[in-house]
Every structure is written in C-alpha cells, then in structure tokens.
Amino acid sequence: MMVFRVEELVTGKKNSNGSSGEFLPGEFRNGEYEAAVALEKQEDLKTLPANSVNLGEEQRKSEKVREAELKKKKLEQRSKLENLEDLEIIVQLKKRKKYKKTKVPVVKEPEPEIITEPVDVPRFLKAALENKLPVVEKFLSDKNSPDVCDEYKRTALHRACLEGHLAIVEKLMEAGAQIEFRDMLESTAIHWACRGGNLDVLKLLLNKGAKISARDKLLSTALHVAVRTGHYECAEHLIACEADLNAKDREGDTPLHDAVRLNRYKMIRLLMTFGADLNVKNCAGKTPMDLVLHWQNGTKAIFDSLKENAYKNSRIATF
C-alpha cells in the first residue's frame, strides 16, 4: 500500500523517483500549490449534501423557539398572583433559598487537654490565673494542697476569684481550699472577687460561707473594695446580703466616703438609697457631705484661677 502526501493528492504529481518521498518545493512556483489547495477546499464544500446545512439551521431555530417558550412560561407563572396565598408562597420560597445559601459555620469544640506529667506549684498557680482547668485538675489529683501560695501568700483561689474563673473556683473549693485564707495584705477570697467584679464568683463564695464582714490589713470590707473599684453589681449584692453600709476602714472612711472621693455617682445613689449615714466622720473629722463641699470648693477655686489668668492675658494682649 502506497502512502501519498497531501501535496501529491492535491496536485496529482509525484517526485522524480515516482514514489512517495520528500516534497520538492521547486515543482510548485508562482502560487500553484496555494491555488490547488483552495480549489480542493471548494470541491469539498460542493460534495457536502445540501440538506445537512439546512438541518443545522433548523435545529438552531427550534432551540431558540424552545428557549423563548420556556421564558414565557416562567413569566406567566410569576405573574399569576391571584390572591395573598400565592404571594405568601413566593415569599416563603425565597426565604428557603436564602436559608440554603447561608451556611452556618460549625464551631469545633477544642479537644480536652490531657496532662500526664506532674504539675509544679508555679504552673498550678498560673493555670488558675489563665483558666486552664486540666492543669489544675492534674495538680489536685496528685494529692497536692490547693492552698499552696506565692511569695505574697496569694493562692490559686485568690487568682481564680480575681479573674472570675468560676469552674476553677468550684474545683478548688471541692478540693478543700480555704475560703478565709489571707494573703500578705490579709485579703480573703471575697476581697479578690469584689476586686475582679465577678458577681457569680461572689455569690458562690457567700453561699459557701465566706464572711461578708471580713477585713483586710487596711480594715477594708468587701463593700469598700467593690465601691472603690466601681463594680456596682457586686456592691448591690453585698448590700442585699446585709453588708455594713457604715463600716470604717483604718482612716475612718465608710464606703460612702470612698464613693464621694472617687466621684462615683451611681455608688453614692445606691448607698444613700439603702440608708448610708451622711454624717459619719472619718479620722480627719470629715463627713461625706464635707468631702462634697471640699470637692466643690476645690473645683470652684480652679475655675476662678483659670478665669483670672484668662483676664490677665487679655489685658496684656491689649497693650
């Protein structure tokens, strides 16, 4: 079987040795090859059946007609709003589409940390501060004391109460942590809870028997601490639990003295509403009202000074 090249089929010519070989460009000059190829293409088009072209056009036309009919049906279905029920159905369908589109992100719960190695005291105290319950549980499960403390005698319970880590507070108390353990400034867990401002921890301590009247080295009660740090809910709960409104610290100040000095309006109103004494004098002989007047006079003196300086500057500017 002989193999012919395209050029031989188109022109009907062969090379000099009469067999299918390398194409000789010298045999076709002045565009003879291009003309032969163009002629062959025209002959191919002539050989195509005439009805095949017509069939392709008819198919395209029929597809266009079908698309137009489908669009028309959709528009007719949309326009058929005979009553309110049809409108409600459409609204519900749109809502369902929206719900399908919005994917609710699945939040994976962190795997529980498994502690196998022994936990030392510094790591245990740090875990209580940073809310790392598995570390605390491992330390306690190894029969260690929950009342170990740092150089300032602050225990894990003090730290957890400050940060409001309720689960750790519960775990420490289950292990026998002392609620009335005092740090270097003689603050107890209830002082630290009010300093941190966590109401749930404060409630837990009181329910477990924490002394509401406990005082630190400055003779401050938990109510003093709550007022100074501005934790309104803690102060309100302490008052509801019958904390002493007029308890004096080492300087003779009551919680109301502290509230006035720090200009905590909500605390002042809270204490006065529940009957705090306005006439109690501190060690300097000042009542809460005296502090208000002193603050007003001090503020008035500052404004008078500023006003006088502004007047002097204006006089200098005129000369």
Curated annotation (Swiss-Prot):
Primary localisation category: nucleus
PANTHER family according to UniProt: ANKYRIN REPEAT DOMAIN-CONTAINING PROTEIN 1, ANKYRIN REPEAT, PH AND SEC7 DOMAIN CONTAINING PROTEIN SECG-RELATED
Alphabetized SMART domains for the sequence: ANK
Oligomeric and partner information: Interacts with TTN/titin. Interacts with YBX1.
Mapped ANK repeat ranges: 152-181, 185-214, 218-247, 251-280, 284-315
Keywords: ANK repeat, Coiled coil, Nucleus, Repeat
Classification of source organism: Eukaryota, Metazoa, Chordata, Craniata, Vertebrata
Gene Ontology, cellular component aspect: cytoplasm; cytosol; fibrillar center; I band; myofibril; nucleoplasm; nucleus; perinuclear region of cytoplasm
Record's protein name: Ankyrin repeat domain-containing protein 1
GO biological process: cardiac muscle tissue morphogenesis; cellular response to hypoxia; cellular response to interleukin-1; cellular response to lipopolysaccharide; cellular response to mechanical stimulus; cellular response to transforming growth factor beta stimulus; cellular response to tumor necrosis factor; cellular response to xenobiotic stimulus
Source species of the chain: Rattus norvegicus (Rat)
Cited SUPFAM superfamilies: Ankyrin repeat
Compartment(s) of residence: Nucleus
